[in-house]
Amino acid sequence: MADPSSYRPRPGEIPDSPGVYRFRDEHRRVIYVGKAKSLRQRLANYFQDLAHLHPRTRTMVTTAASVEWTVVSTEVEALQLEYSWIKEYDPRFNVKYRDDKSYPYLAVTMNEEFPRVQVMRGQKKKGVRYFGPYGHAWAIRDTVDLLLRVFPVRTCSAGVFKNAARTGRPCLLGYIGKCSAPCVGRITPDDHWDLADEFCDFMAGRTGTYLRRLERQMAEAAEEMEYERAARLRDDIGALKKAMEKSAVVLADATDADLIAVAEDELEAAVQIFHVRGGRVRGQRGWVTDKVEEITTGALVEHALQQLYGEEKGDAVPKEVLVPALPDPVEPVQQWLAERRGSGVSLRIPQRGDKKALMETVQRNAQQALVLHKTKRASDLTTRSRALEEIAEALDLDSAPLRIECYDISHLQGDDVVASMVVFEDGLARKSEYRRFQIKGFEGQDDVRSMHEVITRRFRRYLAEKERTGEWADGEGLVDDARHPNGDAAPNGDAAPNDGAAPDDGAARTDGRGLTDGQELTDGPALKDDDGRPKRFAYPPQLVVVDGGQPQVAAAQRALDELGIDDIAVCGLAKRLEEVWLPREDDPVVLPRTSEGLYLLQRVRDEAHRFAITYQRAKRAKRFRAGPLDDVPGLGETRKQALIKHFGSVKKLRSATIDQICEVPGIGRKTAETVAVALARATPAAPAVNTATGEIMDDDDGAPETTADAPGEPVSAGTPDERRGQER
């Protein structure tokens, strides 16, 4: 458990402004999100004597390892941002905001004959208008209850609606005037649809029209001495104003814009971006960059636009971008943005109103980010430098290992044996360099032999890339590649499902540049990454870390010796005792438990283990979901799912004719013939048995294939805890 004083901000560092704050644990996962009218006063409450804290709060602050905050201008903005972050990060200590597995929206089913107002969760549906998300379902119901006085739209379920239509009697809301009772014909479908449309307009922020109309009607009723009607209209106006307070937004509901602010000094610049969608702040991004040359604010904005939208298309590029200064010239940038969006994009400086006020909020966040970066950078660099120096001293290296590669083997009782390679540069994870391997040189469970194979393959590729780049001036180098068949780095880019890692914890991602299994090296100049560095395995580490003890270290060193590599250090980190093992040494190196170097090695080792076991689980799940279509040459996942979706099951596909198979989009005659032949050769498997329920399933039940609409679950023996205990 952490001591809250270890990460308590220094006096004066926290602003006395409204904002939203996040507590993170030691793995950088967000564990709590909260809002405050005064960040300084609220956060001070968390750092008082632990004995005075609520037990749950005490647990939270001792679990946390850091705290950060975002400044906003009003409490309304803080509320909206808090909702967005809770939805995004799913903090474990924010359970009181959770009413189900997703946040509730106020939804209007405009795709029905009689639109219905209801609370909806989960995936959004076409033809339904959504407003939210809200923190609680009761907040939606309170708002709807107020608005039904003025917009008596249907709220009942389909069953209640049909029953009322059958009996000719409306529900209670129909009797008290909070439903127009379309079920019994009191209102036509067109009029009810218009009523629902007005409800949506009001929720979208276009409130002035309806308030003015009601006020005019109230005045007319009073002039005609219809005081009861005037009083009813007065109450309706009060209900609408109360509902407006409950659903306050940052900007108008139709506003989709990105706001970019820049704070800078002579050496560095901080960029902050608020993404506003539907009038609410849906996300925030930011970074700090070094100013390597004299550069204007407009040029910084241009660089930020390129980084933000360089890979985006369509609606991902908003129709309005608000900036503190325009690039010079601005026309090419606007044209570039319009091409990426497919329609015009307004790039301008806000001059007045809510947008200018929100831009000031973004600017304050940029200024805060720059101040915090400058105060933390020195300590961060010092800590990482000290960790690398401690490792170099403990392992007797000539210099600090700026690039560290760590390898781990994972399997389930000897099946689906895989390996991982993770890379840390300057003490930080470089996920684009991660690689995954399938062990195919032998069958069975042998971690030592597996480690030898992986190290051999990785550094044989390094020598091959080194030869191709012309680093060997004498022309001597690797001649015989002699890899195991289908044995190179496994295809990258398929992040394992349900990894569960928060964005900052870093779900295992690769950049898709690894070679597929069995892909051969070709002659010619080596391709370069965008930053000019050699691709794949051409960049050597200064230190290789293996997850294991003396046997694994000896295997890794033997592999390097066989390849003639003598300038790369090797060590192993054994679990439990956290001992560091070196080649040809009988005794381990024991680093102090408080050592920054040991902590860095543990982080590298744990990341390699996580990456390996994630890939192993995904590979095992894929094997359990394998079906006869997997063996059809040239048939990818997209077309397989198209076939299953079209016919419903493999059983029905097997009985289809070639002409019927050709009717599936993307399936030509030749492919259809190949599919038909493959299914004809494949003997239908015996009925599968669901190990959880004991029921027998055939192809029509969705096993063993996974349909496009309903992803299947891997079938494996034992409880989840038992399977985890068997994994390595």
Swiss-Prot record:
GO molecular function: DNA binding; excinuclease ABC activity
Domain GIY-YIG: start-end pairs: 16-95
Region Disordered: start-end pairs: 473-535, 689-728
UniProt source species: Streptomyces coelicolor (strain ATCC BAA-471 / A3(2) / M145)
Name of the molecule in the record: UvrABC system protein C
Electron transport keyword on record: no
Function: The UvrABC repair system catalyzes the recognition and processing of DNA lesions. UvrC both incises the 5' and 3' sides of the lesion. The N-terminal half is responsible for the 3' incision and the C-terminal half is responsible for the 5' incision.
Domain UVR: 208-243
Gene Ontology CC: one annotated term: excinuclease repair complex
PANTHER family to which the protein is assigned, alphabetical: UVRABC SYSTEM PROTEIN C, UVRC/OXIDOREDUCTASE
Composition-biased stretches (Low complexity): 487-505
